[in-house]
Amino acid sequence: WGTPDILGYNRSGNFFTIELKVTKTNKVRLSPHQIAFHVKHPNNTFILVKALSLNSIKLYEGKVIKELDACGLKLEPHSLGLESCFQMLESL
């Protein structure tokens, strides 16, 4: 309820959060609490989605959570693939 799945720091000491999601469809199921958290905390917050149907991992910034809720995986991710996600988080 209200706390993302991962609370982390990168090597530069920058704090970030990640909400983890898995979906079989294009829809990403987000609770009202998860949406509210990312609306209130739009910076250095992320949603990492494992799309089973596409066998891919997509990373979205918290500031686009309303669009992610409305559009699902049709929304362009900030990073695509695990290595790209790691690189982006390390660059914060």
Regions found by a protein language model. Give the residues of each.
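Active-site donor-binding loop signature of nucleotide-sugar glycosyltransferases
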Residues: 20-22, 62, 70
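Nucleic-acid nuclease catalytic cores
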Residues: 39-67
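Beta-rich catalytic cores
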Residues: 2
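Conserved catalytic cores of phosphodiester-cleaving nucleases, focusing on short active-site segments
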Residues: 6-8, 13-24
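Hydrophobic beta-strand residues in large extracellular and virion-surface proteins
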Residues: 18, 47-48, 59, 85, ...
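Short, exposed beta-strand "edge-strand" segments with a Pro/Gly-rich flavor and a Y/T-containing core
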Residues: 24-29, 53-60, 77-79
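Mg2+/Mn2+-dependent nuclease catalytic core
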Residues: 23-42
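Charged phosphate-binding loop/patch that engages nucleotide di/tri-phosphates or the phosphate backbone
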Residues: 72-92
